[in-house]
Amino acid sequence: MVDTKTPGDKTLTMPTKTLTLKPRVEQGVVRQSFSHGRSKQVVVEKRGKRRLGGDEPAAPAAPEVAKKPAPAPAAPPRQQQSRPAPQQSRSGMVLRTLTEDERTARATALADARVREIEERKQAEIEAQRRAEQEKIEKAEREAAEARRKAEEERHRQEDEAKRKAETEAKKRFGDAEPAKKPAETSTTTTTAAPARPATTTTRTPTPAGRPPAVAAEAGDDDEAPRMIRRPGGPARPAPPPKQPAAKPGASKQRGRLTVVTALNADDVRERSIASFRRRTQRLKGHASNEPKEKLVREVVIPEVIAIQELANRMSERAVDVIRLLMKQGAMHKITDVIDADTAQLIAEELGHTVKRVAASDVEEGLFDVVDDSTDTEPRSPVVTVMGHVDHGKTSLLDALRHANVVSGEAGGITQHIGAYQVTSPESGKKITFIDTPGHAAFTAMRARGAKVTDIVVLVVAADDGVMPQTIEAINHAKAAGVPIIVAINKIDKPDAKPDRVRTDLLQHNVQVESMGGDVVDVEVSAKNKINLDKLLEMIALQAEILELKTNTQRPAEGTVIEAKLDRGRGPVATVLVQRGTLRVGDIIVAGAEMGRVRALISDQGETVQEAGPSVPVEVLGFNGPPEAGDRLAVVENEARARQITDYRAHQKREKSAASVSGMRGSLEQMMTQLKTSGRKEFPLIVKADVQGSLEAILGSLEKLGTDEVAARILHAGVGGISESDVTLAEGFNAVILGFSVRANKEAAAAAKRNGIEIRYYNIIYDLVDDIKKAMSGLLAPTLRETMLGNAQILEIFNISKVGKVAGCRVTDGTVERGANVRLIRDNVVVHEGKLSTLKRFKDEVKEVVAGQECGMAFENYTDMRAGDIIECYRVETIQRSL
């Protein structure tokens, strides 16, 4: 095909020249058929093959085909008709309608085409190198195959030669008839095979111009004769035809081929058939099933204990695999068994998962001890705890500071409740919070709580009494809490007051006052006459300045429950000392295993307030139940968090009580204790008190009364009045109900009277402890004391008909009394213990016989007496024991 170029044609240049496609010389239209009856017309361009003159011997025949009249005139009209078309499109339709965007797009396409051309050239070079290497390898293989073929032919030739020699000898033997026939067959075969060899060199007839190339190729293939292959020593066989792709009709050969017309016609798009889509889906499914699934790494949350089945579910693993790993570690388990967190972590990490350890106590994280920013802190009032021995004047000193009278309100004139008050210093005007603690031995826990929440401890010591046991205990509490001590030597107005003796006694307990060269401040005061009270307040304020007490008032409140009780009209009431933040009405609070919402705040003066800042003692109303004294109080953000914390604490409390009651898996010491207490008598009690602190002190005192033989068994202890349920419980165990500063309601009193249940009321803890001690002493077994009366020696045994055997004895020591206990000793061995049934002297019954006299004795239910035995006479006394 020859391309001609007119002067109007433009070459491909950038950026003004456009990229156009020159039409082929021959064009045709073919209708394509698709599935479901669809079809469309496609313009087909026919390209002629360029043939070189030296390649094929059929080249001289080309002019003869060109001289034929049929195809010659048909070619020029097609060229004349096809040439003006590009000129018209270039002159009138392409260049005049091109926009700047189209020019830019075509320039971009041209640049991309150049890049692709460079890449294709590189790929072609690489492919050429690869083909050269492949041809070299194939050539070596062909040479090796040719060498093998020649060796094989040589071997066959030698075999044929040997056969021919054998046949020649056979012909000579059997005659000339068969040898004559054999050459004829051989010549016939040779003649038949001879024309087959030139057939391989026959050439195909050139394709006429008017016939499609596909049809010409088919005709040429049909005209070729089969090529014959002849091997040495064997008949000629037709060679297999070369493998060629199956020829298709001209129209179907262009089917699916992307041409310019097809690409520009966007409306007619070939669609995938449903069967093709199904095959593709099946193929993708097959590939997906054959590919190995990637293992998912999960974050496994592991609590303190977890069941094997639950662990497997959280890891999305099989429980069998988990048990197999445990077996490798030497542990045999079932899927329902529970394992600890460490073992579960090892299993999860072995299986390639990440572990997140959690504990039930995590609900309390961030509840307390949150560090405050130093820029948000403000000074706060000091908290001062007054401690000392009973009757040393602690409450009287506070009354003098507060200008109030609290002592008269306490039963017996002693403090049995812990109280918190605020006092304003007359000189500085600053407030000081005082906490009063009981002094007697029963309230050790109260004193310990007071020392924990305080900043300064005021140790009150009576000048006339000196250092006492509870004074020493208060010193130990203050040292354990790490708070400074101020010694207040009280009752200096008494004539027998000796302040110097108090200072000297304190040295024995590592409390060195300033007058003795130490750093502990001491002040001589008198609560009764109000002497040096202002100096005491001044020393407290000075110590508070040294401590630099600051806190953040805008944060959620934290505090400590000092006292708790169950009020009949107000419900659970807790006395709380706010330590950090500000407690407001409506806050959701948690203290121990109890929660609630603050309904009211009552100050120490009995006034209702809306908020309480740091170091302020208030009564809090709104708890669900009375908390325990000493519990820490905190404000939480919502009720859900508060419920989580209280549920966890209640669960912990139940577990502790269950473990103490069951005693299972206890230590050896616990087992020995249970053996000791197995035969111990119990005194059942039900204790009800007004406040939690008093109840705690009573229970501690009753526990100390117990011995190895008898102990108090507390069936129930609580805060509040005596109810009918308490009476019902006491009836089942025949228990005594103790009420401390509380009374039974009408129904409970009637039920107790009807069922014969004893209810005892007390206001002073000493009286309660003394009465219970006496009652428990009645359960103790009495002590038996043996008193020796005298000894007698048996001289002779007499048989009396009505009495039986009677021993004639002489009293050698002391006296022998009738009815006394006797012990028969033979050869220094006690053979009988009993009582004297008869004591006679000269046929008369007597009450006693003194030493040196002779008498007759008979034993109760015993007659085996011999001469020479010794009789000991003694008296047994019963002595009642007490705790």
Curated annotation (Swiss-Prot):
Biased composition regions of type Pro residues, renumbered to the chain: 235-244
Compositional bias ranges of the Basic and acidic residues kind: 113-184
Positions of GTP binding: 388-395, 436-440, 490-493
This protein's record includes keyword Protein biosynthesis: yes
GO MF annotations in UniProt: GTP binding; GTPase activity; guanosine tetraphosphate binding; translation initiation factor activity
Sequence segments annotated as region (G4): 490-493
Entry coiled-coil feature ranges: none
Keyword Protease recorded: no
Bias (Low complexity): 10-22, 77-89, 185-218
GO cellular component terms attached to this protein's record: cytosol
Stretch list, region G1: 388-395
Alphabetical list of InterPro entries matching this protein: EF-G-like_DII, EFTu-like_2, IF2_assoc_dom_bac, IF2_II, IF2_N, P-loop_NTPase, Small_GTP-bd, T_Tr_GTP-bd_dom
Region (G5): 526-528
Signal sequence residues: none
UniProt-annotated location(s): Cytoplasm
Domain tr-type G: 379-548
Record keywords: Cytoplasm, GTP-binding, Initiation factor, Nucleotide-binding, Protein biosynthesis
Region (G3): 436-439
Predominant subcellular localization, coarse grouping: cytoplasm
Region (Disordered): 1-259
Sequence segments annotated as region (G2): 413-417
Known role: One of the essential components for the initiation of protein synthesis. Protects formylmethionyl-tRNA from spontaneous hydrolysis and promotes its binding to the 30S ribosomal subunits. Also involved in the hydrolysis of GTP during the formation of the 70S ribosomal complex.
Family from the record: Belongs to the TRAFAC class translation factor GTPase superfamily. Classic translation factor GTPase family. IF-2 subfamily.
HAMAP family in alphabetical order: IF_2_B
Protein name (Swiss-Prot/TrEMBL): Translation initiation factor IF-2
Species this chain originates from: Rhodopseudomonas palustris (strain ATCC BAA-98 / CGA009)
